[in-house]
Amino acid sequence: VKRYIDVMAIHKLNTLHWHLTDEPGWRIEIKRYPELTAVGSRRGHTTDESRCLYPCYDGGYDPDAATVSNGYYSREDFIGLLRYAAERHIRVIPEIESPGHARAAIVSMKARYNKYKDTDVEKAAEYLLSEPEDTSRYASVQYYTDNVINVAMPSTYRFMEKVIQELAAMYREAGVPLATVHLGGAEVARGVWLGSPKCQALMKEKGMTKPHDLAEHFITQMADIMQRNGLKFSGWQEVALGHTEEAHRQLRTQAAGVYCWNTVPGYDEVVYQIANNGYPVILCNVGNFYMDMAYNGHPDERGLDWGGYVDESVSFSMLPFSIYRSLRTDGAGNPVDLDAAEKGKTVLTAEGRKNILGVQGQLFAETIRSFNGVEYLLFPKIMGLAERGWNAYPAWEELRGAQEQQAFNKALALY
């Protein structure tokens, strides 16, 4: 991590968004919940996940082995890394995934429940994130069927607040300011909560009519918890979509950043719609800035391809204020008619333009097994990210046709 922070500093990248939790692991020590690391940071052979998570990805069969499947950052590690980053003028934003992508936390708190249920039922259920009676049937994009926190249980909010408070305490000890915690919010599968008695009771009590109302309930509750602790919330684009106007009025004032990632054709208008709606936006365009996308379609290339292929020219071509013209080829590699790309699309308003805070690159680690893999997928792609972060108005943006192509080619050659 220190090597990566050094690389960021060299390229004048000023914010590290640290994805500390997800399905396959919980990677930060929280003293109040030792199960999060005793269970949630380890993967191996198990029949009940009482001492570790099931194996996934490469290896992960021995929960005690020193592999990429196992391990976490201790409290002392994290505090030291916060200071190291601050010395290099880099802000660290921690992410605690919720309510989806939360399987490691859910399994860990279930293990805690099972540890105490025969001796102290109240203590066992104090921080439980799942409802034993929930019969909901769903599958996430990654094919998990039990990765979403139950948003109707008071124990969920107790758990989240204590985690946030411990994170804030680490920042205080490090002498580093904390303004926001990223709450995730992405990719909650359809079908969640439909078989949960507690969720159905909450819907009836609050007059809710659709499952999304529960997601709205969660993010507004969490925004209030964050505010109570002197923080603003951040989240992926889903945290700002589909809400009532009442919820939008609340969330606009409590949001530090909405991270817009899904810019594949058909969804790319969402970015400017969110900015025009008054939310602060960070541009995370999958087609330009997902560093875990493969460089190309060669079978030996490591990386994913669901969002297209990303190389240094693709990251360089991103236009923050003309996102529809940010991809110069389609998924099949055919040239895009850039002059027609914006027709009929949502226009970024003057007020919306003020809400574009910056750009961010993502590197998810499903296909990575070592730091060499990190370096391979980041370089030289990351240079395009840095260029666009510091030069949001490249010379070719206002040009069209052959002039635009010539200006782009010249800038790319110099870059």
Please tell me what each predicted stretch does.
Residues 24-87, 102-152, 191-210:
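Aromatic- and acidic-residue-enriched carbohydrate-binding clefts of CAZyme catalytic domains
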Residues 15-20, 92-96, 101, 178-182, ...:
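Short beta-strand segments at enzyme active-site cores
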Residues 97-98, 134, 141, 145, ...:
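Active-site groove signature of glycoside hydrolases
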Residues 9, 79, 86, 227, ...:
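Anion (oxyanion) recognition and catalysis
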Residues 1-23:
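A conserved hydrophobic secondary-structure block that centers on an alpha-helix together
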Residues 154-161, 165-181, 201-415:
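Substrate-binding groove of N-acetylhexosamine-processing glycoside hydrolases
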Residues 20-24, 32, 96-102, 155, ...:
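Active-site-proximal loop/turn and secondary-structure-junction residues that shape catalytic pockets
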Residues 4, 81, 92, 222, ...:
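Aromatic/hydrophobic pocket-lining residues that form π-stacking "cages" and hydrophobic walls in ligand
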